[in-house]
């Protein structure tokens, strides 16, 4: 059986083997998953049902609390809460009827639905009984008020008639009415059935006295008393109706309590039942999962063992064959009996072994030829290396000479450039000096012109000074004559006595003015004389300055001519320096180009030398490798 299975699997591809193994594992995993899924689904369903049952229990508790609140308060708010709780419970029970499949729990739900129906009926009866009770309470109030009002009127009438005895009978009846009313009020507020008989007895006693009262009072009060008796009869009937309504309310409330207990018990029983079903489903799910897991492990281990043997054994055979090839043994061949990927691998190993036999045989012959060729190449390479080394030495000498020449050319170019710069600077300075000399000539010529103008102005000033002197002579003569006239006038005034005193004063003033004028004229004459003397000296100096200025203009013109000659000479020097610098730069460029070419030749020589050395080294290495290959090829057994 195993041989047939091994042979069948040996012809199946590894891809299908692995697919079969992993597919089986995946199918088993899927089976376990479906089993767990089914168990979890069942448990979740039971949990949901338990949750819904707990909701029924919650609504039942809320219904009980609402019923207790309504029993204590009897108001609209508590009534609305009770109706809401009952509606929620009925809706939840109807919902659960479509979810429960177990007959026992379904029967319990039917029981709960019936209990809800009875509870609703009892609740309706409770509301009707409460309505009748409240109506009876209203009748009690109106009947009692009417009877008391009628008795009060009779009392007031009897009191006004001063019928004391009759009034006392009416007061006694009124007291009995109040007593009966008090008993009824106690009964209606307490709701105790024992108080009902006490209240009825009090009403009957008051009613008997009320009916006997018309015989004790005037006949005019008989109608009022009859109406009061009728009202008290209605009062008694209302008490009876109140008692009946109270009894019906208590009975309905008791039925509600009983049905609430039924609802709660049914919910508890359903909770216990569903819990048992859930636990059973959980146990069943655990059992199924355990069985499925054990089966999956067994089948998985079996598949893993079979597939592993189908893969490992041929791999080990192939590995041993590869190790023989690695050790150099090419004498043996691998026998192939499979058609899967591993069989194809073994066939490839067989073909590789045969190919290696042929390859190693060919390599052995080629290695011998390589060794002899490497020895010849090594000898040629040594000769080439010696020639390249000689070329390298000569090239280094040429490169050194070119470097020295390049440095000298650079120095010449640098000196020519410096000389050109110095000539350019000298040319600029000469041009600047020529310009300054031209400006100096112009300034000196303008100065000479101004000196001539100043000399002419000084001559004119001298002429004007002479004119001022003649005018001053006239003024001086006039002042002397005025002084003489003033002196004569003073003498004549003195001769005239008192009559000429005023004229004498004027003559004195005129004489004094003439004397000051004469003194001022003399001072101006002295100033004019000094001015004329200074003007004469300045005119003499200006003549000398004009002569010197003319000499300076002539010298400056000669200096300008010399600077212009220097400028032309420096410009010529600058042009020649520029030509020298240009030639030096061209020579420098050519020298650098030659130097680069020589350096390239030297680099090529270095590269050639290095290549020759590397070729020689490679030749030696090739010879060594040939020997080594011969040794390696010798390790293989063909």
From Swiss-Prot:
Pfam families, sorted: HAMP (PF00672), HBM (PF16591), MCPsignal (PF00015)
Keywords annotated in UniProt: Cell membrane, Chemotaxis, Membrane, Methylation, Transducer, Transmembrane, Transmembrane helix
GO process annotations (BP): chemotaxis; signal transduction
Membrane topology: Multi-pass membrane protein
UniProt main location, coarse: membrane
SMART domains: HAMP, HBM, MA
GO cellular component: plasma membrane
Location of the HAMP domain: 309-361
Subcellular location: Cell membrane
Family stated for the protein in its record: Belongs to the methyl-accepting chemotaxis (MCP) protein family.
PANTHER family: METHYL-ACCEPTING CHEMOTAXIS PROTEIN MCPB (PTHR32089), METHYL-ACCEPTING CHEMOTAXIS PROTEIN TLPQ (PTHR32089:SF120)
Protein's name according to its UniProt entry: Methyl-accepting chemotaxis protein McpQ
Organism: Pseudomonas putida (strain ATCC 47054 / DSM 6125 / CFBP 8728 / NCIMB 11950 / KT2440)
Organism placement in taxonomy: Bacteria, Pseudomonadati, Pseudomonadota, Gammaproteobacteria, Pseudomonadales
Gene name in the database record: mcpQ
């Amino acid at each position: 059986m195993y041989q047939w299975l091994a042979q069948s699997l040996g012809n199946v591809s590894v891809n299908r083997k692995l697919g079969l193994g992993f597919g089986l594992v995946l199918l088993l995993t899927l089976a376990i998953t479906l089993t767990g899924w089914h168990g979890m689904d069942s448990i979740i369903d039971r949990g949901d049902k338990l949750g819904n049952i707990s909701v029924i229990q919650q609504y039942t508790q809320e219904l009980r609390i609402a019923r207790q609140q309504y029993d204590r308060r009897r108001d609209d708010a508590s009534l609305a809460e009770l109706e809401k709780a009952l509606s929620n419970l009925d809706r939840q029970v109807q919902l659960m009827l479509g979810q429960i499949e177990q007959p026992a729990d379904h029967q319990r739900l039917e029981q709960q639905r019936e209990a809800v129906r009875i509870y609703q009926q009892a609740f309706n009866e409770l509301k009707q009984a409460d309505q009748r009770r409240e109506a009876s309470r209203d009748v009690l109030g109106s009947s009692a008020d009417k009877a008391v009002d009628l008795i009060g009127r009779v009392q007031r009438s009897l009191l006004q008639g001063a019928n004391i005895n009759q009034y006392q009978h009416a007061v006694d009846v009124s007291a009995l009415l109040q007593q009966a009313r008090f008993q009824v009020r106690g009964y209606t507020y307490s709701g105790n059935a024992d108080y009902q008989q006490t209240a009825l007895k009090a009403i009957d006693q008051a009613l008997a006295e009320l009916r006997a009262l018309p015989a004790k009072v005037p006949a005019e009060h008989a109608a009022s008393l009859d109406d009061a008796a009728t009202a008290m009869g209605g009062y008694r009937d209302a008490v009876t109706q109140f008692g009946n309504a109270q009894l019906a309310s208590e009975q309905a409330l008791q039925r509600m309590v009983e049905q609430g207990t039924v609802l709660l018990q049914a919910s508890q029983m359903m909770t216990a039942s569903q819990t048992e079903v859930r636990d059973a489903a959980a146990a069943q799910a655990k059992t199924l999962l355990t069985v499925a897991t054990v089966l999956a492990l067994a089948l998985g281990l079996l598949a893993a063992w079979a597939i592993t043997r189908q893969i490992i054994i041929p791999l080990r055979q192939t590995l041993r064959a590869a190790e023989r090839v690695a050790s150099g043994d090419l004498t043996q061949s691998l026998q192939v009996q499979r058609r899967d990927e591993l069989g194809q691998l073994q066939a490839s190993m067989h073909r590789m072994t045969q190919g290696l036999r042929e390859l190693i045989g060919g390599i052995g012959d080629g290695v011998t030829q390589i060794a002899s060729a490497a020895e010849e190449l090594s000898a040629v390479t040594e000769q080439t290396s010696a020639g390249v080394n000689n070329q390298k030495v000569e090239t280094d000498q040429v490169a050194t000479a070119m470097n020295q020449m390049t440095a000298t050319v650079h120095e010449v170019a640098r000196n020519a450039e410096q000389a050109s710069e110095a000539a350019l600077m000298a040319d600029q300075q000469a041009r600047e000096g020529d310009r300054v000399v031209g400006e100096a000539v112009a300034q000196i010529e303008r100065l000479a012109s101004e000196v001539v103008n100043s000399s002419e102005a000084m001559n004119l000033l001298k002429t004007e000074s002479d004119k001022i002197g003649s005018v001053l002579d006239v003024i001086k003569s006039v002042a002397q004559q005025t002084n003489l006239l003033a002196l004569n006038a003073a003498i004549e005034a003195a001769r005239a006595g008192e009559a000429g005193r005023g004229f004498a004063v004027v003559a004195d003033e005129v004489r004094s003015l003439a004397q000051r004028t004469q003194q001022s004229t003399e001072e101006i004459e002295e100033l004019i004389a000094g001015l004329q003397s200074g003007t004469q000296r300045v005119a003499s100096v200006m003549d000398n300055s004009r002569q010197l200025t003319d000499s300076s203009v002539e010298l400056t013109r000669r200096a300008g001519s010399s600077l212009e000659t220097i400028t032309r000479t420096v410009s010529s020097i600058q042009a020649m320096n520029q030509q020298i610098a240009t030639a030096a730069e061209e020579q420098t460029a050519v020298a650098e180009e030659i130097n680069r070419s020589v350096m390239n030749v030297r680099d090529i020589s270095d590269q050639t030398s290095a290549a020759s050395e590397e070729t020689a080294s490679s030749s030696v290495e090739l010879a060594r490798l040939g020997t080594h290959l011969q040794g390696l090829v010798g390790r293989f057994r063909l």
